[in-house]
A protein has these predicted regions:
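NAD(P)+-binding Rossmann beta1-loop-alpha1 motif at the extreme N-terminus of oxidoreductases
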Residues: 1-64, 131-132, 194-196
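NAD(P)-dependent Rossmann-like dehydrogenase/reductase catalytic/cofactor-binding core
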Residues: 2, 208-269
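Short, well-ordered alpha-helices that flank and scaffold nucleotide-derived cofactor binding pockets
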Residues: 17, 21-25, 49, 83, ...
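Small-residue helix-packing motif on alpha-helices
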Residues: 34, 44, 62, 108, ...
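Rossmann-like NAD(P)(H) cofactor-binding subdomain of soluble oxidoreductases
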Residues: 51, 59-136
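Internal alpha-helical scaffold of NAD(P)-dependent oxidoreductase catalytic cores
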Residues: 107-117, 133-171, 183-220, 265, ...
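Short pre-catalytic strand/loop immediately N-terminal to key active-site residues, enriched for Gly-Thr
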Residues: 119, 168-173, 225-230
Length: 269
């Protein structure tokens, strides 16, 4: 059963720490069912102290203690790490979840063996505030219970969707890269506020909260974004002037170009 599974994280960096924090703080996973190891003992001890998770001395000890392993190390570590633990993973029939960017399910299976159930998960930076948008895909060996585990884990630090692996590049261009675009937009709003007399800190709070509320409105409404735009724009009013200025300066085309550029770069890697 999903609730009985023990999960181990190889790697305790920022993303892994955010995921572990979400898993425990959401109440969806018990801290004593989670194991963590990292070459940086300080990071592991911090998670152990703050969240009550188990510390493993190394990857092999961790694998022998859990049912599911989350690979949360840098992609360039895979070539040396995975062959060194493949025997233990195969012997136990361990379910492997990777959150490493740019490593396909096939590449992971090539390093671990073709009989290993593997899921690939792509969270975004907003996992650190438990508002991530994640996507996942699996090989044919992943069963329904394991898929449910992936969704339960990812939903503990945000929202999650299942997509085909070939769509990961466009998902990355939107969910992975757009936080940076959103930060730029929010900062631009704030700087415009400063230009017109607001203090920077106050302007930033106003801009960020407004964007947060607008995003929430879209998620909680069945209305198309342009319907919401029309509702805010009064005839001859201030908002329609700003909307027209954005259109005249290529706002929509610029956003599309940014996504296209990120998508093409991801495909070329």
């Amino acid at each position: 059963m999903v609730n009985d599974m023990k999960i181990g994280f190889i790697g305790a960096g920022n993303m892994a720490s955010a995921i572990v924090g979400g898993a425990v703080k959401s109440g969806k996973f018990a801290s004593n069912d989670i194991y963590v190891c990292d070459i940086n003992e300080e990071k592991v001890n911090k998670l152990k102290t703050e969240l009550g998770v188990n510390a493993a001395a190394d990857a092999l000890e961790l694998i022998n203690s859990v049912d599911t392993v989350v690979l949360a190390v840098k992609p360039n570590v895979f070539a040396s790490l995975l062959p060194s633990v493949s025997k233990n993973i195969n012997n136990k029939g361990t379910f492997v979840i990777s959150i490493a960017a740019g490593k396909s399910v096939a590449e992971i299976n090539n390093l671990l063996g073709s009989n290993v159930p593997v899921a690939r998960v792509m969270p975004n930076i907003n996992a650190t505030v438990l508002e991530a948008m994640s996507a996942y895909c699996c090989n044919a060996l992943v069963n329904d219970e394991q898929k449910a585990l992936v969704e339960k884990l990812c939903s503990s630090f945000g929202k999650v969707v299942s997509i085909e692996e070939e769509k990961f590049s466009i998902f990355s261009a939107i969910a992975g890269c757009s936080p940076a675009y959103a930060y730029m937009f929010i900062d631009s709003l704030a700087r415009a506020g400063v230009k017109n007399g607001l203090a920077k800190g106050q302007a930033l709070e106003i801009a960020a909260q407004t964007v947060l509320g607008s995003a929430k409105k879209i998620l909680e409404s069945n209305e198309h974004p342009w319907e919401l735009v029309d509702r805010v724009c009064s005839p001859g009013g201030t908002t329609i002037e700003g909307v027209c200025a954005l259109q005249e300066n290529g706002f929509e085309a610029t956003v599309t170009s940014a996504v296209d550029a990120s998508y093409l770069k991801d495909k070329s890697l």
